[in-house]
Amino acid sequence: MSKVTYIIKASNDVLNEKTATILITIAKKDFITAAEVREVHPDLGNAVVNSNIGVLIKKGLVEKSGDGLIITGEAQDIISNAATLYAQENAPELLKKRATRKAREITSDMEEDKDLMLKLLDKNGFVLKKVEIYRSNYLAILEKRTNGIRNFEINNNGNMRIFGYKMMEHHIQKFTDIGMSCKIAKNGNVYLDIKRSAENIEAVITVASEL
């Protein structure tokens, strides 16, 4: 069976061939744009691609982030289950190899930092759409993009991150002034990072609330 077939099977037939195909494309590249997805699938046609992206969003498997698209934790579970199904049927030795790999853990200090972040976000009037774990990172996703900010994150690599889109330069400057590093992608996505500590988390959220 093809990769698409295993994705469909792992989804318990929630997905069909087109939605599964597009989900795989989005999973391969974080923040891929709808235009880029259409370029990958000219055979499907723009209207079909757009429609199926909409279906994936409604099913909670894909989310918009600025102009980009990312898969959700639920979609990642489907993909992981599909890989397991493939291994069971075609290469059981892969399961042994995978069993030796340890997923990055959600550590106790991450939990503490996440709780502090959520407390401060609430205190400063930020309204959250949801909090989720994505690739062993805590994401506090705002209900509406605020001053370009989409997410506040507690990351497994020891950093706190702000993920934004087309943030104003003088707003970015306020964050870099407190020691955050900044990366700006060509598509307008902004990544602001700083080492996690209670002091830094409070400073970041204070600056964000004063923009």
From Swiss-Prot:
Known DNA-binding region:
23-42
Cross-referenced Gene3D superfamilies: Transcription regulator MotA, C-terminal domain, Winged helix-like DNA-binding domain superfamily/Winged helix DNA-binding domain
Q: Which GO terms describe its molecular function?
A: DNA binding
Pfam families named in the record: MotA_activ, MotCF
Name the UniProt key words of this record, in alphabetical order: Activator, DNA-binding, Transcription, Transcription regulation
What InterPro entries does the record point to? MotA_Tscrpt_reg_C, MotA_Tscrpt_reg_C_sf, Phage_T4_MotA_Tscrpt_reg_N, WH-like_DNA-bd_sf, WH_DNA-bd_sf
Transmembrane feature ranges: none
One further remark on this entry is: MotA synthesis starts immediately after infection and stops abruptly some 4-5 minutes later.
Q: What does this protein do?
A: Required for the transcriptional activation of middle promoters. Middle promoters are characterized by the presence of the conserved sequence [AT]3TGCTTNA (MotA box). MotA binds directly to MotA boxes.
Q: What is this protein called?
A: Middle transcription regulatory protein motA
Please name the gene that encodes this protein: motA
